[in-house]
Design a protein with these regions (language model features):
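Sec/Tat signal peptide C-region and signal peptidase I cleavage site
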Residues: 16-20
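Amphipathic alpha-helical segments
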Residues: 21-136, 140-148, 170
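Bacterial N-terminal signal peptides
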Residues: 7-15
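Positively charged n-region of N-terminal signal peptides that target proteins for export
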Residues: 1-4
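Short, exposed beta-strand-loop hairpins at the edges of beta-sheets
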Residues: 151-153
Length: 171
């Protein structure tokens, strides 16, 4: 009997503790869109990306032209010349693939530039969210932009504007 009473009290206390926890959410996309430095960084990244995409695309166009030229002239070329042209095409294609990887690979220039420009802003946002969570005694703050399965969120629990204010941006 004592065990049942102790267990009941434990369940009752833990249910009260669970009910006392506060939850809120932010929309990190909304926050970032309202920070001019983030928008400027994103524009710079987009500009670089387009520039690099054009460079890679132009390189592949050169390879394509080399291949078409080779196909048209192959009947006139000696075996030695065919081999040299094939090697030149393969070498050029490898150069372009390496260039593409250099710009857009996992540790590529675009990734590094994004780390340089965007990460400090994201770190500031995260710091502000953590400060608000501590000040407001929130147990959990969700991000609705992260693609989680939040089917409904009451706007009164949205702390996005509070985060922007903490970062010094009026909205």
């Amino acid at each position: 009997m004592k065990k049942i009473v102790v267990l009941s009290v434990f369940v009752l206390l833990t249910s009260f503790a669970a009910m006392a926890q506060k939850y809120a959410f932010v929309d990190s996309d909304y926050i970032r869109k309202n920070i001019p430095a983030f928008n400027a960084a994103q524009e710079q990244l987009d500009k670089l990306s387009k520039q690099w995409e054009k460079e890679v695309s132009d390189g592949y166009a050169v390879v394509e032209q080399m291949y078409k030229s080779y196909q048209n002239e192959s009947v006139l070329l000696s075996q030695d010349m065919k081999t040299k042209r094939e090697e030149a095409i393969v070498t050029k294609e490898k150069e372009i693939k390496d260039l593409q990887n250099k710009y857009f690979g996992v540790e590529g220039e675009l990734f590094k530039k994004r780390e340089e420009l965007v990460k400090p802003i994201q770190d500031e946002i995260l710091k502000a969210i953590k400060e608000i969570a501590v000040e407001g005694s929130y147990a959990v703050i969700f991000d609705t932009a992260a693609g989680g399965n939040i089917l409904f969120a009451n706007p009164k629990y949205d702390l996005s504007d509070q985060v922007l204010q903490k970062l010094g941006y009026k909205n």
